[in-house]
């Protein structure tokens, strides 16, 4: 009996090891079948590793319409649906008028003078995973959200995040609002000073592999696609310096380099906020928005 009791005491005292950092990644407009359609293209350390060592939900239901960015991100990070979390679309009726899901006239931009900074999660009625994590640890856990889209950064990060940062087309910088802070952290200023958008827009967009090897997709030059932006053909290679000169920083959103930039600031956030180096679990939410921007232009079967 003594032996048995000691065993149970040992089990009771053993605490499961908690992760130092949880990273949640949403790839906007990525269909489930892409995991298998492009499987041969994936490296061993990315999607193949997730499929081999992780868990794939292959019989799930989306119980709402439409499945747009704001609703999807809110539902993922709150575990609820529009009738509960309050985000009924990217834009929806509120008090008799159409509003942007994250627009907030009571806050001001931080890091820019653009109206793109007048955003917050006030329209989100419930808490996110990050909010609950902060509450559970008496604010010791850190929660940070990053994305090109404001709503894809703000809604996952939630009400009580340490920061949410999104891309400003006017300045080419990542910004936030006074809902979160009065001035940008030094690590964000340092990141913005690198002017990475200029670097990405200084070269052509070319395919990673020979263009005739993309057997999984429709031919590049076809009649089923809109342009990279309205009036510009989406045929690779694309002259990004010329497009940048004509359309400014917003053209970056419609290229794969928008995802590169998103992961660049995600890595900067890990270093700048010391995420994963605390005694409590931290959370970093990342959304790849460029796949959605270009997906609306060229469809689901493009190279």
Q: What residues fall within each predicted segment?
A:
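Signature of Gram-negative outer-membrane beta-barrel scaffolds
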Residues: 297-302
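Stable alpha-helical elements in mature extracytoplasmic
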Residues: 26, 31, 43-47, 72-73, ...
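His/Asp/Glu-rich, glycine-adjacent segments
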Residues: 81, 89-280, 289-296
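Loop/turn elements at helix/coil->beta-strand transitions in domains of secreted/extracellular proteins
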Residues: 18-23, 53-57, 84, 138-143, ...
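Soluble non-cytosolic domains of exported or imported proteins
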Residues: 17, 21, 29, 33, ...
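Beta-strand elements within well-structured catalytic alpha/beta cores of enzymes
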Residues: 19-31, 50, 76, 133, ...
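Bacterial Sec-dependent N-terminal signal peptides
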Residues: 1-17
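Short, structured active-site-proximal loop/turn typified by the sulfatase FGly-forming signature C/S-X-P-X-R
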Residues: 35-84, 142-146
